[in-house]
Amino acid sequence: MKAAQKGFTLIELMIVVAIIGILAAIAIPAYQDYTARAQLSERMTLASGLKTKVSDIFSQDGSCPANTAATAGIEKDTDINGKYVAKVTTGGTAAASGGCTIVATMKASDVATPLRGKTLTLTLGNADKGSYTWACTSNADNKYLPKTCQTATTTTP
């Protein structure tokens, strides 16, 4: 009588290890991209929080507020920060069509490597046509940008 096999053969174990390796090779980069997008969402949230204030000031006196110091109800640029965002700066050159900018800058450390020091710029436009649009540009790779940053959004003054 033949004894029943107990355990796994070396080939079976090698196949399992190979499958785990393939799954890890797919999952790790996907998780890193997810983490980077989550970090960028903080930047978008902090920058978007200033759109109403900047729009209001532009509507009232046609100027673009600069927040290098606390002014016009907007905190100083380095006071507007987060876990991954170093600062959010407002400014720009006022024109009839807008021109005000909100620039959020990522920290140089403790952030996903492809995002270190990258900026997101929201630019006020279309002001001369009765409604404002905020165009979003960034020097970060497009795959990390939130969908709301990939198209202009309209707000009524």
Curated annotation (Swiss-Prot):
Pfam assignment, any one: Pilin
Keyword Acyltransferase in record: no
InterPro entries in the record: N_methyl_site, Pilin, Pilin-like, T4P/T2SS_Core
Residues annotated as transmembrane: 8-28
Alphabetical keyword list: Disulfide bond, Fimbrium, Membrane, Methylation, Transmembrane, Transmembrane helix
Residue stretch(es) of the prosequence: 1-7
Signal peptide: none
GO BP: any one term: type IV pilus-dependent motility
Gene Ontology terms: cellular component: membrane; periplasmic space; type IV pilus
Intrachain S-S bonds: 64-100, 136-149
Record's bilayer topology term: Single-pass membrane protein
GO molecular function, one term: glycosphingolipid binding
Location in the cell: Fimbrium; Membrane
Glycoprotein among keywords: no
Main location, first listed in the record: other
PTM annotation (N-methylphenylalanine): residues: 8
PANTHER family assigned: GENERAL SECRETION PATHWAY PROTEIN G, PREPILIN PEPTIDASE-DEPENDENT PROTEIN D
Sequence similarity: Belongs to the N-Me-Phe pilin family.
Subunit structure: The pili are polar flexible filaments of about 5.4 nanometers diameter and 2.5 micrometers average length; they consist of only a single polypeptide chain arranged in a helical configuration of five subunits per turn in the assembled pilus.
Protein name as annotated: Fimbrial protein
Species this chain originates from: Pseudomonas aeruginosa
Taxon lineage: Bacteria, Pseudomonadati, Pseudomonadota, Gammaproteobacteria, Pseudomonadales
